[in-house]
Amino acid sequence: MAAPALSGDQIRETFLKFFEGKGHRRLPSASLIPEDPTVLLTIAGMLPFKPIFLGQQVAEVPRATTSQKCIRTNDIENVGRTARHHTFFEMLGNFSFGDYFKKEAIAFAWELVTEVFQVPAERLAVSVFEEDDEAFAIWRDQIGVPEARIQRLGAKDNFWASGPTGPCGPCSEIYYDFHPELGNDGLDLEDDSRFIEVYNLVFMQYNRDAAGNLTALEKQNIDTGMGLERMAQVLQGVPNNYETDLIFPIIQAVAAIAQRDYASESESVKVSLKVIGDHLRAVTHLIADGVTASNLGRGYVLRRLIRRVVRHGRLIGIDRPFTAEIAETAIALMAAQYPNLREREAAIKAELTREEQRFLETLERGEKLLAELLAAATDQIRGEDAFVLYDTYGFPLELTQEIAEEKGLTVDLAGFEAAMAAQRQRSQAAHETIDLTVQGSLDRLAEQIHPSEFVGYGDAVATAKVTALLREGQSVEAAEAGDRVQIVLDHTPFYAESGGQVGDRGVLTGESLIVRIEDVQKESGFFVHYGQIERGLLQVGDSVTAQIDRACRRRAQANHTATHLLQAALKLIVDEGISQAGSLVAFDRLRFDFNCPRAVTPEELRQIEDQINQWIAEAHGTVVEVMPIATAKAKGAVAMFGEKYGAEVRVIDVPGVSMELCGGTHVANTAEIGLFKIISEAGVASGVRRIEAVAGPAVLEYLNVRDAVVRDLSDRFKAKPEELSDRVTALQEELKANQKQLTALKAELAIAKSDALVSQAIPVGDAQVLVETLTGVDAAALQTAAERLQQKLGDAGAVVLGSSPEEGKVTLVAAFGPAIIAKGLKAGQFIGGIAKICGGGGGGRPNLAQAGGRDASKLPEAIAAALDQLKTAIAS
């Protein structure tokens, strides 16, 4: 008897309720951005509990159960190609912290799978660690699994460890058998065509020391994981995870946009649809948890996934932005379990739209270059060329590798790394963000040094010890004058970039030592000071004096507090429901992105500016307090989305004006800001607006620049500043009149040229066909000429004209008479097809249509094709 079909949501809820009934506390999924500084993303259900398993933290409850969202990209090349590989997945888990152990964990698992989910026992097989006789006996003697259905596997598959030392233990797994009729002879649980692992039980019972010796733990723990998508495949009786109700609605939405029928498509099209369905789930959750696309760290993972989605969309014929539209389906599917998706919907769509548009701007040119490289390569794409695709066109290296592999080629990785290193050497600017090389080095150092202590809220100068030194991202013991370095101090007054505020600048000094610090980033708990040694030798262990640039700090403080005032003013004047979508607090300017469905009016901007300057003039003191997060929320403090908060939070309060959770630096009194001036307001994505502004000394600098521009224009136009507006209006009217006259002259020229072309029409049956190229004729004139020619040729006239009015651009126009249309030819469809030859497209009405292209060298080919196709169509 088959197990009853359950929806993905029902499977999740059934699992969690089952373990609640077994005394487990249901806990919410943790963020994809882990607390563990050594891990880039949450990759397993146990990760939020790792400090408990490692003995670093005491568990609040003895038993817990969760549905944890996870992301893994180590098998990304298999996504869509196998039945069960994903980047995003949900891991259902039950955990015991020193409470029950092996016997109970196995019994719970078997009861859930066979009695609650009603999976027939004959469909199941289990594995145990080859030396775990206890687990083997429990499965055989207490659960009743036939010995032939229990397989012993080695440490590679069935022994878990957190690292070379520390807690570890054997695993046991439950497998679903798609073909039990094949019997038990030669049973191979690693045969993916027959078995799928659905439940993994980890028994943490040992501690491994540096010598590799195992000793029993005083408190034994249980960590389990059931893949929701895998169990859905089993219970829903579908051939793969992608066709479950957790993912397939997304695939169907993509197929609808691409005008594809999933069931009847080729395997390659299905792979692309599956990749998009999988990746859209991943990127939606990443953005919801505060990740933004970049070339580094988590941002790089997000960018890589979005760009794979866009490329696979193009492979199946989607030639327009579509990710935000599909995100709506993904959000609707998952919002009940993850309500932050709905709360962050506007930000998700905005980030997807922004990143997709950025990639599309260079994708076509990059694809053209890549096509040329693929055609020229015999077995390998040069590393330098792969780097150009990465650096200039935004192609992640992995994407180039994937496309190359489809053509049976490889990429020269060593050459790519060499080109990357050469580019780093050419760049003289400080790193603006931490890169993966630095992060990897810090991860390796994490076990040897303590995280940095920040003392910069109260001190601008501090004596500190150099605990780590990196050059080009690699750990070194010493560096000398001229070297660009990354420095970790035991404590520091330098603020590290976070919450939108840029890192401090300043200097490190010592005996005969000067290091100019240009930027500070925080990663893995360390404050990383980016700079260049101007004089002397710097070594790990040195004592240095760390001093921030006070002027830069004061400017950042003014801009940061001004940003808080700006959000308060927006809520007061525009809409109380406005929420922050992003920000930048630099030394010379500030930027604030916010969720709002409409533009802020000029009058509202004036009111906002006036209100902020009034608060500045009123000299409100700022109050900084550290309090429990629950207390802060109860007081109405606004949280910045994407920031991670602990049990205790820092609150910046401008009494009666603004209260926000914030780790940044701020003025002690609003009067220190001086002045505030809005520079611009614009939309950056659907539902997201951006205000750019200046505060403090930057206002005077901005006004001085404006004044210089006005003076220059006054001199050029021989007009007083107050007369400039009228003078510019008059010039615009004059230009408009001249352009109108020029258009008329071009039309007259086109008509004259068209009159001369009438005699060149050729008869095709009872029709008159004219296909020609005109030089120096723009789109409007070309259309006028085509219409006139068709009228002269009569109802049976068919005209196609082409021109290249600008370098690299093509314009094509078709004009068909009623008799031509009656033969089934439509100008819009016809000219759109011809334009593809020139790398473009277009369309219009059946009698008159226009198209464009980007490859002028193909215009003669397009004109010839138009004539051939017209002859064939009319003659038939």
UniProtKB/Swiss-Prot annotation:
<keyword id="KW-0547">Nucleotide-binding</keyword>
<dbReference type="Pfam" id="PF01411">
    <property type="entry name" value="tRNA-synt_2c"/>
</dbReference>
<dbReference type="GO" id="GO:0008270">
    <property type="term" value="F:zinc ion binding"/>
</dbReference>
<dbReference type="InterPro" id="IPR002318">
    <property type="entry name" value="Ala-tRNA-lgiase_IIc"/>
</dbReference>
<keyword id="KW-0030">Aminoacyl-tRNA synthetase</keyword>
<comment type="function">
    <text>Catalyzes the attachment of alanine to tRNA(Ala) in a two-step reaction: alanine is first activated by ATP to form Ala-AMP and then transferred to the acceptor end of tRNA(Ala). Also edits incorrectly charged Ser-tRNA(Ala) and Gly-tRNA(Ala) via its editing domain.</text>
</comment>
<dbReference type="InterPro" id="IPR018162">
    <property type="entry name" value="Ala-tRNA-ligase_IIc_anticod-bd"/>
</dbReference>
<dbReference type="InterPro" id="IPR018165">
    <property type="entry name" value="Ala-tRNA-synth_IIc_core"/>
</dbReference>
<dbReference type="GO" id="GO:0006419">
    <property type="term" value="P:alanyl-tRNA aminoacylation"/>
</dbReference>
<keyword id="KW-0862">Zinc</keyword>
<dbReference type="InterPro" id="IPR009000">
    <property type="entry name" value="Transl_B-barrel_sf"/>
</dbReference>
<protein>
    <recommendedName>
        <fullName>Alanine--tRNA ligase</fullName>
        <ecNumber>6.1.1.7</ecNumber>
    </recommendedName>
</protein>
<dbReference type="InterPro" id="IPR018163">
    <property type="entry name" value="Thr/Ala-tRNA-synth_IIc_edit"/>
</dbReference>
<comment type="similarity">
    <text>Belongs to the class-II aminoacyl-tRNA synthetase family.</text>
</comment>
<dbReference type="InterPro" id="IPR023033">
    <property type="entry name" value="Ala_tRNA_ligase_euk/bac"/>
</dbReference>
<dbReference type="GO" id="GO:0000049">
    <property type="term" value="F:tRNA binding"/>
</dbReference>
<dbReference type="GO" id="GO:0004813">
    <property type="term" value="F:alanine-tRNA ligase activity"/>
</dbReference>
<keyword id="KW-0694">RNA-binding</keyword>
<keyword id="KW-0436">Ligase</keyword>
<feature type="binding site">
    <location>
        <position position="560"/>
    </location>
    <ligand>
        <name>Zn(2+)</name>
    </ligand>
</feature>
<keyword id="KW-0963">Cytoplasm</keyword>
<dbReference type="InterPro" id="IPR045864">
    <property type="entry name" value="aa-tRNA-synth_II/BPL/LPL"/>
</dbReference>
<dbReference type="InterPro" id="IPR012947">
    <property type="entry name" value="tRNA_SAD"/>
</dbReference>
<feature type="binding site">
    <location>
        <position position="662"/>
    </location>
    <ligand>
        <name>Zn(2+)</name>
    </ligand>
</feature>
<dbReference type="InterPro" id="IPR018164">
    <property type="entry name" value="Ala-tRNA-synth_IIc_N"/>
</dbReference>
<dbReference type="Pfam" id="PF02272">
    <property type="entry name" value="DHHA1"/>
</dbReference>
<dbReference type="GO" id="GO:0002161">
    <property type="term" value="F:aminoacyl-tRNA deacylase activity"/>
</dbReference>
<feature type="binding site">
    <location>
        <position position="666"/>
    </location>
    <ligand>
        <name>Zn(2+)</name>
    </ligand>
</feature>
<keyword id="KW-0479">Metal-binding</keyword>
<keyword id="KW-0820">tRNA-binding</keyword>
<dbReference type="GO" id="GO:0005524">
    <property type="term" value="F:ATP binding"/>
</dbReference>
<dbReference type="GO" id="GO:0005829">
    <property type="term" value="C:cytosol"/>
</dbReference>
<keyword id="KW-0067">ATP-binding</keyword>
<dbReference type="Pfam" id="PF07973">
    <property type="entry name" value="tRNA_SAD"/>
</dbReference>
<keyword id="KW-0648">Protein biosynthesis</keyword>
<dbReference type="InterPro" id="IPR003156">
    <property type="entry name" value="DHHA1_dom"/>
</dbReference>
<dbReference type="InterPro" id="IPR050058">
    <property type="entry name" value="Ala-tRNA_ligase"/>
</dbReference>
<feature type="binding site">
    <location>
        <position position="564"/>
    </location>
    <ligand>
        <name>Zn(2+)</name>
    </ligand>
</feature>
